[in-house]
C-alpha cells in the first residue's frame, strides 16, 4: 500500500478509470435483475463500480470495503448523495449482512487467506444470493504468471492460485460454483499494457478473451 492507497492516489484514479469496460462486461454476465438490490463490493477501491451500479442498474443500496483508507475517503466523497456506504476494512465489516449480491474484481489473487474470505462472503449473503468474482491474475494465465513473478515481493502477493484452487475453496465453503469468460466487445488498446513486460496487443487480447474469467459462487437457497 502506498500513501494510504493501493498503488498511490494518482495510480488508483487511473486504474479505476481504466476498469469501465471490464465492469460493463461483468454486468453483462449477471443473470439477475439488480434493481432495488442490496449489493456488496469487496475491495471497492474508490467506489467506481458501485457508482456505476447505482447510476445504471438502479440498485437499492451499495456497500463497499477496502483496506486502503485514502481510497475509501475518495469513495465517500465521489458518492455524493448516492445510497452508498464505504468502510476501511480487510474483510466484510462487522454487522454487514443481508446482501442480495456481491462482487469483486481482481481481489482474490491478493488474499493470503482465501478460505476466510469465502466464509465471510458466505455469511454476508442471503440464501440464494450469488457472489460474482472476476480474476485474471492466476497461475493458468501465462501473461499474469510473469506479472506475478515480477511483483510478488513488492505487493506481498500469495500464490499465484490456479482456477481449480479458487473453485475448490469456495465449493468447500458451501457455494455452488460456476465460471465463465467475460463477454468483451472492444478492448481499449492502452488498457494495462504498461503493467507487464509483454505489451503486445495480441497477448492482451488473449488475456481478456481467454484468461480473465468471472466466477459465480451461489449460496444455496
For each feature predicted by the language model, list its residue ranges:
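Conserved class I S-adenosyl-L-methionine
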Residues: 1-33, 52, 132-157, 191
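Class I SAM-dependent methyltransferase SAM/SAH-binding core
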Residues: 46-91
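A conserved beta-strand element that flanks and buttresses the S-adenosyl-L-methionine
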Residues: 103
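Short catalytic micro-motifs in class I SAM-dependent methyltransferases
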Residues: 106-110
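A short glycine-rich, Lys/Arg-flanked "PGG" loop and its adjoining helix->strand segment in the class I
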Residues: 115-127
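A C-terminal cap/extension of S-adenosyl-L-methionine-dependent methyltransferases
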Residues: 145-149, 178-221
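Short alpha-helix
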Residues: 157-174, 180
Amino acid at each position: 500500500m502506498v500513501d494510504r492507497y493501493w498503488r498511490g492516489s494518482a495510480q488508483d484514479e487511473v486504474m479505476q478509470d481504466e476498469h469501465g469496460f471490464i465492469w460493463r462486461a461483468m454486468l453483462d454476465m449477471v443473470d439477475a435483475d439488480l434493481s432495488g438490490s442490496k449489493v456488496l463490493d469487496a475491495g471497492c477501491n474508490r467506489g467506481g463500480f458501485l457508482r456505476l451500479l447505482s447510476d445504471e442498474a438502479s440498485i437499492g443500496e451499495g456497500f463497499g470495503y477496502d483496506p486502503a483508507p485514502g481510497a475509501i475517503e475518495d469513495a465517500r466523497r465521489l458518492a455524493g448523495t448516492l445510497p452508498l456506504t464505504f468502510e476501511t476494512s480487510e474483510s466484510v465489516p462487522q454487522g454487514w449482512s443481508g446482501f442480495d449480491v456481491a462482487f469483486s474484481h481482481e481481489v482474490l489473487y491478493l488474499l493470503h487467506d482465501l478460505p476466510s474470505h469465502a466464509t465471510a462472503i458466505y455469511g454476508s449473503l442471503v440464501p440464494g444470493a450469488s457472489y460474482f468474482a472476476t480474476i485474471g491474475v492466476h497461475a493458468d494465465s501465462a501473461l499474469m504468471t510473469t506479472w506475478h513473478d515480477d511483483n510478488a515481493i513488492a505487493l506481498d502477493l500469495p500464490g499465484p492460485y490456479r482456477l481449480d484452487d479458487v473453485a475448490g475453496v469456495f465449493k468447500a465453503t458451501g457455494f455452488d460454483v460456476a465460471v465463465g469468460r467475460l463477454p468483451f466487445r472492444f478492448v481499449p488498446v492502452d488498457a494495462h499494457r504498461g503493467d507487464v513486460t509483454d505489451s503486445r496487443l495480441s497477448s492482451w487480447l488473449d488475456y481478456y478473451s481467454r484468461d480473465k474469467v468471472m466466477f459465480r459462487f451461489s449460496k444455496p437457497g
